[in-house]
A protein has these predicted regions:
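Alpha-helix-loop-beta-strand connector modules within alpha/beta enzyme cores
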Residues: 20-25, 68-88, 131-135
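Short amphipathic alpha-helical segments and helix-helix/interface helices
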Residues: 9-13, 29-30, 71-79, 128
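Catalytic cores of alpha/beta
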Residues: 25-37, 46, 83, 88, ...
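CE4/NodB-like, metal-dependent polysaccharide N-deacetylase domain
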Residues: 12-13, 31-39, 43-48, 130, ...
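Catalytic beta/alpha-barrel core
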Residues: 1-33, 49-54
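Short, low-complexity, charge-dense intrinsically disordered segments
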Residues: 42, 138-145
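Structural motif corresponding to alpha-helix initiation and N-cap regions
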Residues: 7-8, 26-29, 71, 95, ...
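Glycine-rich phosphate-binding active-site loops on the catalytic face of alpha/beta enzymes
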Residues: 4-12, 52-65, 98-134
Length: 150
């Protein structure tokens, strides 16, 4: 796949893989996922498979990079459909936040800083088991299919 952002918004000619984008506002999410919106910043608008919205919480890896959205803003965006299965939460994500991210209707979560901080730990199996358990609804089998995190 290919990941686009404000600086790099061009898709290589004849590209056939998945396309994602970084977003830092609800407006960017709406612009990215609304197939009726006009041209993208540098040419025809691509069809995005998913977008990352950040920062949802204070960044773990970028010290001083604070969250941008209030709980109320995220709740409203989830209820209105701005946040949906194509929107991946990024920024300050830890396993304990999974229930809240689900309540806001995020389609998934990116655990960058938390994973990076644990790179020297030897309990990866325990960490991944914790994430899987938080992703699996109570009483359901854990059957992550790769297309949706939840």
């Amino acid at each position: 796949g290919i990941h686009l952002n404000r600086r790099n918004s061009q898709i290589p000619e004849n590209f056939q893989g998945s396309i994602s984008r970084s977003c830092h506002s609800f407006e960017e999410v709406t612009e990215s996922l609304d197939n009726t919106s006009p041209d993208f910043p540098k040419g025809p608008k691509p069809t995005f498979d998913y977008v990352f919205l950040s920062p949802i919480f204070d960044s773990i890896s970028k010290k001083g990079y604070k969250h941008t959205f209030s709980n109320r803003d995220l709740e409203d965006a989830g209820n209105s459909g701005i946040i949906n299965e194509k929107v991946i939460a990024l920024g300050g994500i830890i396993p304990q936040f999974i229930p809240q991210l689900r309540a806001w209707n995020f389609g998934g979560a990116a655990f960058l800083g938390d994973v990076w901080n644990r790179r020297h730990e030897y309990n990866w199996k325990e960490y991944l088991t914790d994430i899987r358990q938080r992703l699996t609804p109570r009483g359901a089998k854990n059957t992550l299919n790769g297309s949706n995190v939840w």
